[in-house]
């Protein structure tokens, strides 16, 4: 936002990004920059190029803060991973924007995602990530659920939902099997096949948590059935740095599954309240039904 002689003028996201780019590279010409939005459920990412530089701009947005998104944390995490070659490199952290390198390559297609050869690549990438030193940002799941509860549409609340929420807030969580740095939003839209290999993008929810929780999130997010889950676990546990006891890991994933389902349900409900977009109600409905939440 800026002020003119006639009053307040609100700048668009693209105008704000353009200003950030021109401050970062003051010798470039503003008119040479081309900016376009990138697809996603939050619509806060932009691609920018002037022919010489190719940049992804990720905005710090107020609704994202309510969901736990923090670009300063994401900046620190990506710098932490800079030697692993599994994530984009940070160009700069400037006010309101995280600027990243644009990675050439193609997003993984849905039909490619569950193929055996791809599962091997994905397992190798995730075991590499899960074997890194901790980020230093542990997942505060109860705090997250409590925060989301304050932001949902109160018109949708029912006594059964209140009882369910109290149960998750007060019940003991599964013990940690292996604490690791994790991505928490692994799906085909966030996986990029590049000339340098498979990479993960969109690290805004990355955290430190149990690998069982992370893999339960992977399975839920991608709607993998039992055979697909077992295929992946064989690949994951077969990696040199994979978790060795596949049976124990599978049990741990099952223990975490209700917690993951509820976390994702709450995310959809908050996004519905924020955006009014009915797609979030549709995405939430199967999870609501699994918990017996009806109107």
What is each stretch, according to the model?
Residues 36-138:
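ATP-binding pocket architecture of kinase catalytic cores
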Residues 28-36:
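Conserved N-terminal boundary motif of the eukaryotic protein kinase catalytic domain
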Residues 5, 159, 266-295:
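ATP/Mg2+ or Mg2+-diphosphate-binding catalytic cores
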Residues 71, 251, 255-259:
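Start-of-helix signal in alpha-solenoid helical-repeat scaffolds, especially tetratricopeptide repeats
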Residues 212-243, 258-275, 290:
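Active-site activation/catalytic loop segments of kinase-like enzymes and analogous catalytic loops
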Residues 41-51, 55-57, 169-213, 227:
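Active-site acidic catalytic loop and adjacent metal/ATP-binding pocket
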């Amino acid at each position: 936002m800026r002020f003119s002689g006639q009053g307040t003028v609100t700048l668009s996201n693209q105008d704000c990004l353009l200003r950030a780019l021109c401050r970062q590279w003051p010798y470039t010409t503003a008119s040479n920059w081309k900016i376009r939005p990138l697809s996603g459920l939050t619509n806060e990412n932009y691609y920018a190029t002037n022919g010489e530089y190719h940049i992804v701009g990720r905005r710090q947005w107020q609704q994202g803060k309510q969901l736990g998104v923090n670009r300063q944390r994401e900046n620190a995490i990506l710098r932490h991973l800079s030697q692993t070659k599994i994530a984009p490199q940070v160009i700069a952290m400037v006010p309101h924007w995280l600027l990243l390198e644009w990675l050439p390559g193609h997003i993984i297609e849905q039909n490619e995602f569950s193929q055996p050869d791809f599962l091997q690549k994905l397992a190798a990438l995730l075991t590499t990530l899960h074997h890194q030193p901790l980020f230093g940002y542990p997942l505060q799941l109860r705090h997250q659920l409590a925060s989301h509860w304050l932001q949902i549409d109160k018109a949708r609340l029912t006594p059964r939902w209140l009882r369910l929420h109290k149960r998750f807030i007060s019940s003991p969580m599964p013990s940690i099997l292996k604490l690791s740095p994790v991505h928490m939003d692994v799906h085909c839209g966030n996986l990029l096949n590049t000339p340098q290999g498979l990479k993960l993008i969109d690290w805004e929810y990355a955290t430190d948590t149990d690998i069982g929780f992370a893999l339960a999130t992977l399975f839920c997010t991608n709607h993998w059935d039992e055979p697909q889950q077992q295929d992946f676990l064989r690949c994951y546990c077969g990696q040199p740095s994979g978790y060795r006891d596949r049976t124990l890991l599978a049990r741990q994933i099952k223990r975490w599954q209700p917690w993951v389902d509820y976390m994702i349900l709450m995310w959809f409900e908050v996004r519905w309240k924020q955006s009014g977009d009915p797609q979030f109600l549709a995405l939430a409905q199967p999870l609501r039904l699994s918990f017996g939440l009806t109107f």
